[in-house]
Amino acid sequence: MADSSSTSAFISTLIIYGLTAVVFVWLFLLLRPKNRRVYEPRSLKDIQTIPEEERTEPVPEGYFGWVEYLLSKPHSFLIQHTSVDGYFLLRYIGIVGSLSFVGCLLLLPILLPVNATNGNNLQGFELLSFSNVTNKNRFYAHVFLSWIFFGLFTYVIYKELYYYVVFRHAMQTTPLYDGLLSSRTVIVTELHKSIAQEGEMQMRFPKASNVAFAYDLSDLQELCKERAKNAAKYEAALNKVLNKCVKMTRNKTQKQLDKLYNNGTKPKDDLETYVPHKKRPKHRLGKLPLCLGGKKVNTLSYSSKRIGELNEEIHEKQADWASNDRQPACFIQFETQLEAQRCYQSVEAILGKKNFGKRLIGYSPEDVNWGSMRLSSKERHSRRAVANTIMVLLIIFWAFPVAVVGIISNVNFLTDKVPFLRFINNMPTFLMGVITGLLPTIALVVLMSLVPPFIVMLGKLSGCVTRQETDLYSQAWYYAFAVIQIFLVVTATSSASSTVDSIIDRPRSAMTLLANNLPKASNFYIMYFILKGLTGPTWTILQAVNLLLSKVLGRVLDSTPRQKWNRYNTLATPRMGIVYPGIEILVCIYICYSIIAPILLFFSTVMLTLLYVAYLYNLNYVFGFSFDLKGRNYPRALFQIFVGIYLSEVCLLGLFIMAKTWGPLVLEVFWIVVTALAHIYMKRKFIPLFDAVPLSAIRHARGEPGYSYPTSDLGLQEIKDIADEMKGKYEQDNTHGILTPVTKDDLKKANLIPDNDGSSENGTPSNPFESGSERASLSGSNAESDSIKKLNDTVIKKSSTLSSSTKDNNESTFVPEGEKFRKFHYSDVEALRNKRPYDEDDHSKHGPEGAVPVNADAGVIYSDPAAVMKEPQAFPPDVLETNTWTRRILQFFNPRRSYPFDSVRMRFPLVFNTSIEYDEEYLSSAYTDPCVREKDPIVWCCKDPLGVSKQQIQEARSNGLDVRDDFTRYDEKGKVIFTYNPPDYEPEAKK
């Protein structure tokens, strides 16, 4: 058998990857000060898409001053500046990295001598692995240390799941999340036909303020897509010809200009002067590409007229959208989170399991996959089955190239039986190390990088209701894919290739030989961890792709004001469902080999430490916030750690069987049973609490006397009792119904009043859900009776613990006494105050005293000035000063004392003080397909000094198309410049 190449591969890999990492870090330090938009965009004041609370301070001076600066910040700082999802990602890396370090301290001093001495005298890293042991009694050290190490992992998983549940419950009771529209809306899908009516749902949930159903709006959706496509083409074509006009006149002599204008007979502001009609941009109609498409048309004239026609068609369908077929999904809105949680926790008991598919809470209208709303249970299950089948087939076929990678990692063992590979034996040691260490690790990274986009696409096609569900679907399948390919396939092929000679000679002992050589596969993962630990983090902070897009491709590809604005103001956002599995598989590998080849723990510790630092920088300074998953990837990642524990235990079991060591075998079987029982217990205890918030927790946070957080079981029993209580009330209700004022929309459906066109002058459809002040009487008279008027004067108002008009005994435990909003006293905040988005004399908006108001797409956002100004009190410390190290160590083994509800809540940043007052018009139609509320497009072109843009604006306006050149100009080089936001830009309020 050939000798192991682990030492030469290790040295070659370490040198090459080490030098690569040094180059990446050097480039990062060199380029960062001169390219702040690439390396610290979150600190720039002129990026409009970053709310002030999320903006970070500039990177501290010094090459690595930011490391100490960020590591010294409390968790509250990270929650505010990296988002809840970013915070839990960092926490996950920190937790598993710390456990890897503990494993080094616990396992290496014992297992390395046990493995290395008086064994099989193997070479290289194999000397330090399980396969070098010959004395069967030594295996007791492995089994008992596996108990300790895996037991520690299991307890930490339990402790972190406990923390996550308390964190979620505390977060949901903060002023921000308590008042969100998504926190007050329950989504129920796949409803049975017998209850898919507003009246049926109102009858079962009488405290609902609004019940909205999804509708089949496929025709309207197609029209909106066509309009958006034409608007994009028109905007690109218009800016293209304007750029050409400016280019034709820039740096021209008077003689050349006279020739261009034909001595004054051609107007300067006419596009025909510069670009004749026949030479203007054209495109083909239809969906087929290039010459296979339909008729070729002038883009400017055709799109302008077509958009005007589409505007009229869309307005008609938007005004009459409720007449379409209803879909089996409804959105039940409540005035408070308390009632929404009561509904969410009792939906299954009241409706029955067979009468609906899924119940969801905490998802905004933007989160909903509206195309999935029409699916019935059978259709959704069929889609999921098809998507899962495709994933299984992908895993099977992807195993072949990955298997080649595993074989290459131990290719030197195949030279005796594969003649054409014998030339490898004549290679220098360093080159052999490159082939067996460098080449397979790079190939594996490339192969795995091709998979995520496909998995995300399958998630969307599988019938996921929300984009969060799609993300969690991607996380589950990408992790499964990685475990099978990176661990199982590579381990099997690598160990098989190293034993092929012996298997051919002794086929009956193939299983024993494979088991004994399984630890040799750890050599590949040492190289893989070096790659991930050295080049991974340094490549991440180098931001080479963003640098290329910003400095090279952006300047070539972006020619319109909107393209340039998007390039500058749009930040990259991490997709957590893809980021997590990439780290989880590394954790799985080091757990699996922690007992078999413990030396791997040293490399995993270094790798995870560097990954933590890299993500700490990027999440604070580079990445923007993605859609809000509320940290849901974190508990899934914790549960998926059990995969690594099970695999490690099964591998040890197989090794003990092959070694015929029955004592360690029985002990390992016992621990597998303990692990499985702990896993089942945690799933039953914690998963039902991820989205359900105990009502007592909400009331306790509001300061209602007699309520406290249910620490004993985190509210699990209370949630079950609420379901039984609500079911009992519904069954005892004799009337099974409620009386509500009739709306004009109801009267139109009943043909009692004419269905007039409700479109407004600006093309925005009338409100499909009438607000309280627009209720109509059944009598047909314009005057309403006093009793009806009293009912109709009710308006949904946002109640906030930050308001100066809070009720007695309603003091939030979130904001301590004396820490209410203060008066403005900083110049920056004074500037915000002067730009108050609403009239000082208009009392229709009642924000908290001293709050910083900002107009947004769905209402007004009121922020805490301390959070906006990054004042020290905005970031509470992690641990009270009275907590000594001894006390903290003791509390580690008692999650109830480590994470009491009130303490966790008080540690949140003051950004959770934010309050949002939604517009009534938005609230009434929030949970409808976005195409119902979609506004007419605004084309944004660059203002040229010739006046051509103004002429084109007038021409487009005659066709019903809104074109504007606000906040744009050409610089002295003839390049497009934007000076402010697009005319259709609005800051987004959290929903």
UniProtKB/Swiss-Prot annotation:
Subcellular location as annotated: Cell membrane
Induction: Regulated by phosphate levels.
Disulfide links within the chain: none
Composition-biased stretches (Polar residues): 757-785
Domain of life: Eukaryota
One GO term of the biological process aspect: phosphate ion transport
InterPro entries: Csc1-like, CSC1/OSCA1-like_7TM, CSC1/OSCA1-like_cyt, Csc1/OSCA1-like_N, PHM7_ext
One GO molecular-function entry: calcium-activated cation channel activity
TM spans (from-to): 10-30, 92-112, 139-159, 389-409, 438-458, 472-492, 524-544, 583-603, 605-625, 638-658, 662-682
Function: Acts as an osmosensitive calcium-permeable cation channel.
PANTHER family assigned: PHOSPHATE METABOLISM PROTEIN 7, PROBABLE MEMBRANE PROTEIN DUF221-RELATED
Family: Belongs to the CSC1 (TC 1.A.17) family.
Protein name in UniProt: Phosphate metabolism protein 7
Native species: Saccharomyces cerevisiae (strain ATCC 204508 / S288c)
Upper lineage: Eukaryota, Fungi, Dikarya, Ascomycota, Saccharomycotina
Gene from which the chain derives: PHM7
